[in-house]
Amino acid sequence: MNWEVVKLRLNMALATLGIVLLGFALALAVADYAFGAQFGVGLMLSILMFIFFLNIIQWLFGPYMINWAYRTVEVTPTDPVYGWLYSTVAEVAKYNGFRDVPKVYIADVPFPNAFAYGSPIAGKRIAFTLPILKLLNRDEIMAVAGHELGHLKHRDVELLMAVGLIPALIYYLGWWIFWGGMFGGGGGNGRGNNGGLLFLIGIAMMAVSFVFQLLVLSINRMREAYADVNSALTVPGGKENLQLALAKLTLSMDPGALEKFKKKSTTNQMASMLFFTNAIEEVPTWNARELVEIWKTTKVPWYAEIFMDHPHPAKRIQLLEKVSKY
């Protein structure tokens, strides 16, 4: 049994459950205080239904919008140029127990990235941008595919969409309380002449929703780490090739990253790297290997990734090292 994986799964489960329970408890208590139990619960349910409906629409039709925004072209097994990419994804899909191969797309955008997406009506999909295909070799592409297919296998989109309802619920509840205070109070224990108090509670709730959004980001970082682990455990050579892929992506976006990490700079937010532009197309493998070795011993302070949706690359490298020991 791989205890690092067990620990990661336990942390994800506890964090997700904690955010949901704490968020609902806070919203229910504040709604009761501001509007009374009956109206407060009704308002909460109405808000939840509203944001749930919007999220469902976005989830169902989002893949089509992504294809349009990223100018994607589907790759078929017989494609004379990129047929190898389809066969690569098919091989990784087999390793991960997929019954059908997800649809494979190439995105015509100027930065290196890969992403998995899909919905019940659009099916499972995985896309690679043209720059990442030039930057990485086939083994590294396989490792990246193992990461992305891990998101599909673990249903990360659906889970994060569900958890993301909590900060939205708290924000819109705060918005209602804010305007209730502006017009003289609600209908619960805080009504009457406490419009000013409700006004402040509304502002506080909207601020608290931002804190919950940071907690959701922490869940996202865990899911990204879990996808890394999936690649390491299901793809032959996945650990080493995913490490090299991450280093090459970092160096392509910031050719000076190696020197920065040599100076032990741990505040550079690399997780946003996948959304930069003007990447270089070739990165020497020995530079990537050197950066991986530096990351293995880099100490990352807790606050370095608080606003990031991906773990710090050094943490990703170190987790992959721990997982591979079992």
Swiss-Prot record:
The protein's Enzyme Commission number: 3.4.24.-
Nucleus listed as a keyword: no
One cellular component (GO) term of this entry: plasma membrane
Keywords annotated in UniProt: Cell membrane, Hydrolase, Membrane, Metal-binding, Metalloprotease, Protease, Transmembrane, Transmembrane helix, Zinc
UniProt-listed GO biological process terms: proteolysis
Transmembrane segments: 10-30, 41-61, 159-179, 197-217
InterPro entries documented for this protein: HtpX_protease, Pept_M48_protease_HtpX, Peptidase_M48
Cofactor requirement: Zn(2+)
Residues annotated as catalytic: 148
Subcellular location: Cell membrane
The keyword DNA-binding appears for this protein: no
One Pfam assignment: Peptidase_M48
Enzyme class: hydrolase
GO molecular function, one term: zinc ion binding
Record's bilayer topology term: Multi-pass membrane protein
Gene3D superfamilies found in the cross-reference section: Metalloproteases ('zincins'), catalytic domain
Positions that bind Zn(2+): 147, 151, 224
Cofactor binding notes: Binds 1 zinc ion per subunit.
Family according to the record: Belongs to the peptidase M48B family.
HAMAP family: Pept_M48_protease_HtpX
UniProt-recorded name of the protein: Protease HtpX homolog
